[in-house]
């Protein structure tokens, strides 16, 4: 059971791809009007268009008095590494696109196993000393790497990471076993991405859909489709969702919440996220309508115990083939 409701962060991955400037701008406004303040983007999202769109909104990001917090990431992909020069290039390019002097949170998007981590961390510390970001974050690192990084930073007097962004939802709970205790020990808060398992937990898909023609989504018609298919498109996942849908109908009858409502409420009320420790859920979207629906669901209350039990049964069905939280 969650302790106090986790915060909500706006995931900007689809800005500049499935969302144009107008819908992106409207989504940011809708998000901020509900009292949320943090936006998450990355150097690689939509080939830089996500950051560019956010920078053009005139939010005054990274400046004194700005209530909106912005996070971005450097990644070892598309010809880049996490060597010092590439980390600097990515962050400084992100700052130009975002039109801000500094970001509130700068992540290492995932590990670069070809670069000694000490080199990357020292480069991050230098960039922090230059005032180019406030907090350091990690994403997609295995728990022993997190422990190693925290130990190295403490030993060398470098900036310590304070946030970890990882994959977590009702049917993807690998992070609970070893990563969460590690993060609590070192004082990192956890930001969950894929809270709806790429859309699988909306309940709108059937296993057989993989063989037909489908509208564009995380699973179909985009550069990351195969990644998401490999993560979540397994028969046991659909069997688990059916268990939850049955429990919803049995427990609530004709007024049963939707599958997506149940999945969002599980994240905010029944997961291991703790609002008191600064944990958060990253909500992405492919349209303004979808975002407004999900933001309304965030404000709903806890689920009945029978539905929480059904989510646990679903997790037990799929745990053996849970995708790794690290790369």
Swiss-Prot record:
Citrate binds at residues 109, 228, 231. The keyword Cytoplasm applies. The record marks 73 as: Lowers pKa of active site Tyr. It catalyses: a primary alcohol + NADP(+) = an aldehyde + NADPH + H(+); aflatoxin B1 dialdehyde + NADPH + H(+) = aflatoxin B1 C(6a)-monoaldehyde + NADP(+); aflatoxin B1 dialdehyde + NADPH + H(+) = aflatoxin B1 C(8)-monoaldehyde + NADP(+); aflatoxin B1 C(6a)-monoaldehyde + NADPH + 2 H(+) = aflatoxin B1 triol + NADP(+). GO terms for biological process: aflatoxin catabolic process; aflatoxin metabolic process. Its EC number is 1.1.1.2. It comes from Rattus norvegicus. One of its GO terms (molecular function) is NADP+ binding. Belongs to the aldo/keto reductase family. Aldo/keto reductase 2 subfamily. It is found in: Cytoplasm. The modification Phosphoserine is found at residue 2. Inhibited by citrate. Keywords: Cytoplasm, Detoxification, NADP, Nucleotide-binding, Oxidoreductase, Phosphoprotein. Induction: By the phenolic antioxidant ethoxyquin. Homodimer. Heterodimer with AKR7A2. NADP(+) binds at residues 13, 18, 40, 140, 194, 196, 198, 204, 218, 286, 290, 293-294, 327. Catalyzes the NADPH-dependent reduction of various carbonyl-containing compounds, including aldehydes, ketones, and toxic products from cellular metabolism or environmental exposure. Can reduce the dialdehyde form of aflatoxin B1 (AFB1) into alcohol derivatives, via monoaldehydes intermediates, thus preventing the formation of protein adducts that contribute to AFB1-induced toxicity. Pfam families: Aldo_ket_red. SUPFAM superfamilies: NAD(P)-linked oxidoreductase. This is Aldo-keto reductase family 7 member A3. The active site is at 45 (proton donor). GO terms for cellular component: cytoplasm.
């Amino acid at each position: 059971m969650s302790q106090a409701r986790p915060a909500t962060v706006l995931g900007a991955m689809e800005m500049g791809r499935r969302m144009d400037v107008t819908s992106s701008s409207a989504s940011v406004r809708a998000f901020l009007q509900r009292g949320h303040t943090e936006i998450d983007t990355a150097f690689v999202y939509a080939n830089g268009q996500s950051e560019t769109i956010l920078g053009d909104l005139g939010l005054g990001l990274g400046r004194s008095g700005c209530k909106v917090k912005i996070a971005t990431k450097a990644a070892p992909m598309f010809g880049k590494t996490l060597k010092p020069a590439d980390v600097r290039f990515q962050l400084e390019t992100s700052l130009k696109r975002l039109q801000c002097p500094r970001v509130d949170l700068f992540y290492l998007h995932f590990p670069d196993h070809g670069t000694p981590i000490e080199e990357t961390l020292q480069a991050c510390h230098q960039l922090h000393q230059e005032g180019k970001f406030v907090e350091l974050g990690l994403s997609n690192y295995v728990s022993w790497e997190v422990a190693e990084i925290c130990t190295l930073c403490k030993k060398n007097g470098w900036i310590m990471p304070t946030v970890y962004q990882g994959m977590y939802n009702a049917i993807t709970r690998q992070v609970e076993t070893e990563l969460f205790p590690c993060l609590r020990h070192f004082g990192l808060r956890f930001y969950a991405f894929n809270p709806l398992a790429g859309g699988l937990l909306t309940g709108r898909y059937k296993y057989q859909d993989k063989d037909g023609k489908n509208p564009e989504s995380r699973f179909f018609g985009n550069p990351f489709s195969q990644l998401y298919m490999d993560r979540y498109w397994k028969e046991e996942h659909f069997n688990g969702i059916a268990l939850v849908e049955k429990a919803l109908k049995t427990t609530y009858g004709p007024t049963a919440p939707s599958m997506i409502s149940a999945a969002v409420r599980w994240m905010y009320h029944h997961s291991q996220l703790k609002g008191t420790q600064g944990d958060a859920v990253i909500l992405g979207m492919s349209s303004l309508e979808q975002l407004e629906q999900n933001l309304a669901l965030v404000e709903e209350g806890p689920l009945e115990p029978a539905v929480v039990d059904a989510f646990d049964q679903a997790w037990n069905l799929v745990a053996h083939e849970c995708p790794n939280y690290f790369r």
